[in-house]
Amino acid sequence: MRLIAFLVFATLSVMPLHAATSEFGTKDEAVAMVKRAQEMFKKDGADATFKAISDPANKDFHDRDLYVYVYTLAGVCVAHGARPALIGKNLIDIKDQDGNYLIRAHVEVAKGPGSGWVNYKWPNPLTNKIEDKTSYVEKMGDDYFVGVGVYKQ
């Protein structure tokens, strides 16, 4: 009887933790999503990849609060998993709440080391608050960068 009570308690005490963490993506999942986009880009080319990324039904590039975006190194959005209305817009001068140039920072990572993390503040659609976010960025081909952001928990 004690064993059953212990197992029930252990199961119930872990469930809320799992539910709380499963609603947000992780850094490892963000990196994996960028790698999937890179693989598709190399295999299928830019047009097919950008179309797949911008399709909200495509679960390879959309998972909970994670989504892929791709910009040219000049700052023009060419694919966006959360806001397709941004496609075609030059956002090189967009700033976060603290006045940091968001897309410029992504471009610097892509042109410099070729991959890395960019930190900024951004609206979280799940909480409707401005929150700390970090995005994993990689240069994609010669002309683009690809990224996926994670809200810091």
Tell me the role of every PLM-derived stretch.
Residues R2-Q153:
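N-terminal membrane-sensor/transducer module of prokaryotic signaling receptors
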